[in-house]
Regions:
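Mixed-charge, low-complexity intrinsically disordered regions
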Residues: 1-82
Length: 82
């Protein structure tokens, strides 16, 4: 199983980029959720169940997808100089 790295950028299999802010736990069920921010548009904050965030792309539904996982960690150099 993959490990989520906080404060790192992930690419969604449909192409957009997101910053993982934290892992949150549901107060009633204890289920874990990934808290992530859109790096486009309004930069809003979103949550998704951890197991869904780490799931593989359904290649039957998306046969042309090049990613193996729904979200994949990106190695992005600093953009501070740009």
């Amino acid at each position: 199983m993959q490990k989520i790295e906080l404060k790192r950028v992930y690419r969604h299999f449909k192409g957009d980029y997101y910053l993982v802010e934290d892992i949150a736990r549901h107060s009633e069920t204890g289920d874990e959720y990934v808290v992530y921010r859109k790096l486009y548009g309004d930069g809003s904050l979103w949550i998704r169940p951890l197991d869904m965030f780490l799931s593989k792309v359904d290649k039957t539904k998306y046969p042309d997808c090049s990613q193996e996982y729904r979200f994949e960690l990106q190695n992005i150099e600093s953009v501070a100089k740009y």
